[in-house]
A protein has these predicted regions:
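Catalytic cores of phosphodiester-bond-cleaving enzymes
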Residues: 2-9, 15-17, 24, 101, ...
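Histidine-centered nuclease catalytic patch
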Residues: 40-89, 93-94
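Short, well-structured alpha-helical interface segments that form or flank functional binding sites
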Residues: 25, 33-36, 47-50, 66, ...
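Short, charged surface segments at domain edges that flank catalytic/cofactor-binding sites
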Residues: 1-37, 61-66
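Long, low-complexity, intrinsically disordered segments enriched in glycines and aromatic residues
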Residues: 82-141
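C-terminal, charged low-complexity interaction regions
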Residues: 124-193
């Protein structure tokens, strides 16, 4: 970006020195690419509820700190003390070169969901999926409750199979702003489509 090109012998751009308007532009771009969902759990997020996640943590490889393809938006902007965390804030600096990157074309194929909102590896021998679920706390009670709540309209309305398919097709399509609402598109694709 233009901001990085300002580097000189007296100043080197760093992620910590990234400020608005460049940081806001970066967030908007990532959020558009992710269609308004967390890169890990797929819940709906906004500029006010996200943080920028480094897929390869800065502590592992500082040279990738400003690489666009190494950044994604993860849920939970602020982390109050004693909070049970999930996704990027739970992951912290954990990194395994064999982990499932949210940028992988087929990343969602590694996971399956249950109607109670829980997530599991699609194949119980898939250690990559097991590690992601564990290290990111993707079965955190808060996430399970949110996924279950996303399914509640189907359950509450006692939809027929055809109605469920129509509903799932609707919520797995991006809205006019290019965002998923209510989020969790993989949940609906796995259970219904």
């Amino acid at each position: 970006s233009e901001w990085k090109s300002l580097a000189n012998s007296d100043w080197t751009p760093t992620f910590d020195s990234l400020r608005n308007p460049q940081k806001a532009e970066l967030i908007q771009s990532l959020l558009r690419e992710q269609h308004g969902i967390c890169c890990y759990c797929e819940q709906s997020i906004s500029e006010k509820t996200l943080h920028i996640e480094h897929l390869v943590p800065q502590s592992v490889d500082a040279t990738k700190a400003l690489e666009y393809r190494n950044m994604a938006c993860s849920c939970i902007r602020n982390t109050p003390q004693n909070t049970n965390l999930h996704c990027g804030h739970k992951r912290e600096n954990w990194y395994d070169s064999d982990y499932i990157s949210p940028l992988e074309e087929d990343c969602e194929s590694h996971f399956s969901f249950s109607w109670d909102g829980t997530i599991r590896p699609n194949d119980c021998t898939d250690n990559r999926a097991v590690n992601m679920i564990q290290h990111l706390a993707l079965n955190h009670v808060v996430l399970n409750e949110k996924r279950k709540a996303a399914l509640d309209p189907i359950i509450d309305l006692q939809m027929t199979k055809e109605q469920m398919i129509l509903y799932a097709q609707k919520v797995t399509q991006q809205n006019s702003n290019g965002m998923y609402n209510p989020g969790f598109p993989s949940l609906f694709r796995d259970l219904i489509l």
